Amino acid sequence: MPRLPLVLLHGLWDTPRLFARLESELLERCPQLELYAPHLPHRLGAVPIRELAAQLAVLLDARFGSTHPLDLFGFSMGGVIGRTWLQEHGGHRRTSRFVVLGSPQRGTLAAQWVPRPLLAGIADMKIGSALLRQLDRRAHLLESIDCHSLYTPTDITVFPGWRAVLPRGTRRAVPVLTHRQLIVHPRAISLVADLLLSERSTAMN
């Protein structure tokens, strides 16, 4: 069965170069896999997440058309951008699998005192932010998607670490210590690749 394209969404203060190790691992195991890692400039967190999700919608439509099915992976803030695209831009209709890694789906205390007028994108990740509340109210849109959340309990960027989970799907702690290690440590890379390349029926449990 042909694999769907896999879209990789980077987080705050990062670029698609962040995924070099993961991309290498994925392509070594599955050379025919189509990977797409768009650059979403956050301007140090000043750009609201909804604006970034709208940019993502334009980029995905330009790359794949408006209906081509795909899989989605989001690291950190990228996971919240991806979820916003899924739930507010109709992405749920074309997405088979959604995997988030160290992503503040339930907010993070690290963003709690950030002023929204200066850093709206970071403020969107506050615990109880308007964006996260609205996404939770429409969480049923994720029901048809194979959802998975990976996190580390010792994360101090998404703090507390257990808040880095979607309201649907499986949840698994990754045996690394820091937020950054989630996307660069060999153990984490191997685990993420296992999940992204697994068959849907195998990954769901």
Describe each region flagged by the PLM.
Residues 6-10, 17, 27, 33-46, ...:
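Serine-dependent carboxylesterase/thioesterase catalytic core
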Residues 1-5:
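Proline/glycine-enriched tight loop/beta-turn segments at coil->beta junctions
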Residues 22-25:
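Short amphipathic alpha-helix
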Residues 19-20, 48, 111, 161-164, ...:
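Hydrophobic alpha-helical membrane-insertion segments
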Residues 14, 142-205:
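C-terminal catalytic-base region of ester-bond hydrolases, centering on the histidine
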